[in-house]
């Protein structure tokens, strides 16, 4: 409900665009969000007034595909900002799954993991992505990122 409210306000009240990047989403969740957006009028199937882009990498996809979803969503947001001159709200759900997918790719490439099992390039990967979320003279990107906490245990190093 909160996501829908924010997307609706950005699109209708402020005239901006929204990009939703679903990293490791369940098919049902992505489908539900899509249909909720149609029902609320955020996505219009009748004309070109929609101001939302949805990018998904399902949880059953290979880690390389899941790792690229957040970056693809960010690239779409950069296009809206730089080419269309729009302010953009970027949702990334879930940033932990982005990190997890990167860790899986790193393991497949034979890289030695860090002390808690993450890829040795985690700080660079995350920093590079976060630094692209910025304001320019043409528009801005504001990001809201959901974080999944494994087993709801904040002390879990995963």
From Swiss-Prot:
Source species, domain of life: Eukaryota
Locations listed in the record: Mitochondrion; Mitochondrion inner membrane
Protein name: ATP synthase subunit beta, mitochondrial
Species of the source: Schizaphis graminum (Green bug aphid)
EC number: 7.1.2.2
Group of enzyme by EC: translocase
Chain's role: Mitochondrial membrane ATP synthase (F(1)F(0) ATP synthase or Complex V) produces ATP from ADP in the presence of a proton gradient across the membrane which is generated by electron transport complexes of the respiratory chain. F-type ATPases consist of two structural domains, F(1) - containing the extramembraneous catalytic core, and F(0) - containing the membrane proton channel, linked together by a central stalk and a peripheral stalk. During catalysis, ATP synthesis in the catalytic domain of F(1) is coupled via a rotary mechanism of the central stalk subunits to proton translocation.
Record note on quaternary structure: F-type ATPases have 2 components, CF(1) - the catalytic core - and CF(0) - the membrane proton channel. CF(1) has five subunits: alpha(3), beta(3), gamma(1), delta(1), epsilon(1). CF(0) has three main subunits: a, b and c.
Keywords linked to the UniProt accession: ATP synthesis, ATP-binding, CF(1), Hydrogen ion transport, Ion transport, Membrane, Mitochondrion, Mitochondrion inner membrane, Nucleotide-binding, Translocase, Transport
Family: Belongs to the ATPase alpha/beta chains family.
Main location: mitochondrion
InterPro entries per record: ATPase_alpha/beta_chains, ATPase_F1/V1/A1_a/bsu_nucl-bd, P-loop_NTPase
GO molecular function: ATP binding; proton-transporting ATP synthase activity, rotational mechanism
GO biological-process terms attached to the record: proton motive force-driven mitochondrial ATP synthesis
Reaction(s) catalysed by this chain's protein: ATP + H2O + 4 H(+)(in) = ADP + phosphate + 5 H(+)(out)
Gene Ontology cellular component list: mitochondrial inner membrane; proton-transporting ATP synthase complex
């Amino acid at each position: 409900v909160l996501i829908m409210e924010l997307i609706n306000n950005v699109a209708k009240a402020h005239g901006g665009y929204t990009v939703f990047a679903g990293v490791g989403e369940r098919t049902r969740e992505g489908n539900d969000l899509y249909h909720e957006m149609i029902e609320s009028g955020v996505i219009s199937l009748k004309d070109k007034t929609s101001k939302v882009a949805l990018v998904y990498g399902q949880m059953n996809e290979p880690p390389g595909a899941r790792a690229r979803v957040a970056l693809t969503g960010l690239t779409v947001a950069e296009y809206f900002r730089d080419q269309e001159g729009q302010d953009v709200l970027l949702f990334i759900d879930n940033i932990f799954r982005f990190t997890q997918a990167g860790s899986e790719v790193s393991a497949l490439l034979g890289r030695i993991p860090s002390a808690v099992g993450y890829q040795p390039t985690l700080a660079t990967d995350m920093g590079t992505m976060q630094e692209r979320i910025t304001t320019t003279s043409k528009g801005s990107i504001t990001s809201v990122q959901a974080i999944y906490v494994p087993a709801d245990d904040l002390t879990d190093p995963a």
